Amino acid sequence: MVSQFLVSQLELEFIAIGGRTHLRRAYSRGALKVLRPFPYGEGLVLQLLTLGPGLMGGDQVEIRVHVAPGAKVILLNQSATKVLPARGYRPVVQRLLFRVEGFLEYYPGLTIPHPASALDQRMEVSLGTEASFSWMEMYALGRLARGEVGKFKWIRARTAIFGQVPFYMDALELLPEELGPNHPGVLEGHPYLVCGFWNWESHPFFEETENGLLGVGLTAFRHSFLRGIGNKEVTQRALKIWSQERALRGLPAVDVMRYSSAL
């Protein structure tokens, strides 16, 4: 009997030769694919693709990435990730395993859960002593135009970023049937959520506008994390804040919208 669920894998290895970054190995199976990388200064921009209408409940996804010393990579999804339901409320199970010894920026962009869908995501990032890592992801709580906000079963996401010791641990758990997005202390009715991290120090700030809430704070290791809830404008504001942080870091500007419709 052929399983109706799909197992997808992606393995990527980046190395540096003569000051330039090269994609040394790319293995894909199932719905995950990559396009050819684009040059970005001394580094590369690589788009991740998911074939088909989205990830179906019961599907299993595993992405493994190794960025060797000296390599510089921007990794992003070409389009938003759609989480679709399956019989029996099986979740999409996604595992992200990154070993970073060089420089990696990871932008999965927007995840959109459809009604009755569920997502179980785990991301583990191992950082070398000279590594630089940044990450930003966004969630829409459903398709707003169809009135589907908060109609999914659950989203459970665990993030662990560590070196010799844990640097950053985060747990996101949204259960609309128990605590909906309008419940006090949850999302206050806001339909978008954005979160991010980078392993260098930024100036903390917090802003509250008619569009929502957005802020940057520091961990005990002086690394930076970003959180925001609000409407679509808050996600765009988060990207602007991140663009400013990259400029302060001395990183060359990159138009991520050129490579991804998920942001």
Swiss-Prot record:
Keywords: Chaperone, Cytoplasm, Nickel insertion. It comes from the Bacteria. It holds the Pfam family UreD. GO terms for molecular function: nickel cation binding. Signal peptide: none annotated. InterPro entries: UreD. It is found in: Cytoplasm. One of its GO terms (cellular component) is cytoplasm. Belongs to the UreD family. UreD, UreF and UreG form a complex that acts as a GTP-hydrolysis-dependent molecular chaperone, activating the urease apoprotein by helping to assemble the nickel containing metallocenter of UreC. The UreE protein probably delivers the nickel. HAMAP family: UreD. Required for maturation of urease via the functional incorporation of the urease nickel metallocenter. This is Urease accessory protein UreD 1. It comes from Synechococcus sp. (strain JA-3-3Ab) (Cyanobacteria bacterium Yellowstone A-Prime). The gene is ureD1.
